[in-house]
Structure formats: C-alpha cells, structure tokens
C-alpha cells in the first residue's frame, strides 16, 4: 500500500518542499508506520511506500484539512 501521511487531528497531509528523495518524509513515514516503510516528497506532500494494508493514509473520512 502507498499513500500520503496524514495528521490525525486536522486531516492535513505532511507538507514538504524538496521534491523527490527527502530525509524528512522518509523519517516521518518510518516513525508513523514502521522501519521498512519508504518515503519521498511528491506534489509537495510526503508520500509513503511499502505500508501494511491497514495503514491510515490521506484522506481521512469526515476530516478536511483546515
């Protein structure tokens, strides 16, 4: 599974500036999911890869980013 990492409180994606390989996104994806997850910056948000099927990613139901 793949998807944008999301803030559970406000429903927003984790923003990033440096597109492509990005240490911040990789670190956040691994902290949120697990150490074998991958992550990079895509369309100015952190995209996580190699996730388990039940991983919660953007968009969250009934939550809009404010």
Swiss-Prot record:
GO cellular component term, pick one: extracellular region
Q: What is its main location?
A: secreted
Compartment(s) of residence: Secreted
For this protein, the record's InterPro entries field holds: LCN-type_CS_alpha_beta_dom (IPR044062), Scorpion_toxin-like (IPR003614), Scorpion_toxin-like_sf (IPR036574), Scorpion_toxinL (IPR018218)
Q: List the disulfide bonds.
A: 12-65, 16-41, 25-46, 29-48
Any one GO MF annotation of this record: sodium channel inhibitor activity
Name the organs or tissues of expression. Answer: Expressed by the venom gland.
Domain LCN-type CS-alpha/beta positions: 1-66
Q: Which Gene3D superfamilies does its entry note?
A: Knottin, scorpion toxin-like (3.30.30.10)
User: Keywords assigned by UniProt?
Assistant: Disulfide bond, Ion channel impairing toxin, Neurotoxin, Secreted, Toxin, Voltage-gated sodium channel impairing toxin
Q: Fill in the domain comment.
A: Has the structural arrangement of an alpha-helix connected to antiparallel beta-sheets by disulfide bonds (CS-alpha/beta).
- Report the family membership: Belongs to the long (4 C-C) scorpion toxin superfamily. Sodium channel inhibitor family. Beta subfamily.
User: What protein name is recorded for this chain?
Assistant: Beta-mammal toxin Cv3
Q: Which organism is it from?
A: Centruroides villegasi
